[in-house]
Regions:
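Surface-exposed cleft-lining segments at the edges of enzyme active sites
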Residues: 47-58, 92-97
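Short, hinge-like loop/turn segments at secondary-structure boundaries
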Residues: 17-23, 96-98, 138, 183-184
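Hydrophobic/aromatic beta-strand patches that form the interior of the parallel beta-sheet core
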Residues: 1-4, 118-121, 164-166
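Phosphate-binding/switch loop-helix module in NTP-utilizing enzymes
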Residues: 52-74
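NTP-dependent small-molecule kinase module
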Residues: 127-189
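A glycine- and Lys/Arg-enriched "phosphate-lid" helix/loop adjacent to the NTP-binding pocket
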Residues: 77, 82-152
């Protein structure tokens, strides 16, 4: 059995539930999801940043440290679309004023999160990424500038040193073959 999970710190189903509860309690005083000046200003407040990061990290401790670990130990193949590196990148872009890496909860996440057997990073030029976001009708797409920062880190950043980088402009069959070879499902020749 295969278990698939998409996760980015602060945008998991668990975190969406928490944000929904806060919106219900606080009403209009809480900014809506997505990119906005109001949201950016709110998240720049030290206590709001700390609360948001703490909640997101607790959620990830449960998701990675309990759900992913348990399913893996039960013999399921677990596929994580986005993982710790993506979350670290998100946190650094969204909270440049916070040294989240020094937070005890962040160190706990790293400790409880299972290490992947294989990691892949499918790279696309920013222009194609923007095009695909429009086609998928992403509700809160990243700006061109943010995508450029992400791509630079994906290509050169130490966060992703252990990832197998794949040119996602290649055909689907070529990409599939590269992944299957890396997983040992095809002859490496």
């Amino acid at each position: 059995m295969v278990y698939y999970v998409w996760s980015r710190g602060g945008y998991t189903p668990g975190m969406e539930l928490v944000k929904g509860v806060f919106r219900g309690i606080l009403g209009r005083s809480l900014p809506s999801s997505g990119h906005s000046q109001t949201r950016t200003e709110s998240l720049s407040s030290p206590w709001v940043s700390y609360l948001w990061l703490t909640t997101a990290m607790l959620d990830l401790i449960f998701l990675y440290g309990v759900v992913v670990r348990l399913r893996s130990q039960l013999g399921q193949v677990v596929i994580c679309d986005r993982y710790l590196g993506d979350t670290a990148l998100d946190f650094s872009l969204n909270f440049p004023q916070v040294e989240f890496e020094k937070m005890r909860l962040w160190r706990l996440i790293i400790w409880v999160t299972p290490k992947p057997d294989n990691s892949f990073l499918l790279l696309l030029p920013v222009s194609i990424s923007i095009e695909r976001s429009k086609l998928k009708q992403e509700p809160f797409p990243d700006s061109k500038e943010t995508l450029e920062k992400r791509l630079t880190v994906y290509q050169d950043g130490a966060l992703f040193d252990e990832y197998e980088r794949i040119d996602a402009l290649q055909g689907i069959e070529v990409i599939e073959e590269q992944i299957k070879k890396k997983l040992g499902l095809l002859d490496a020749s």
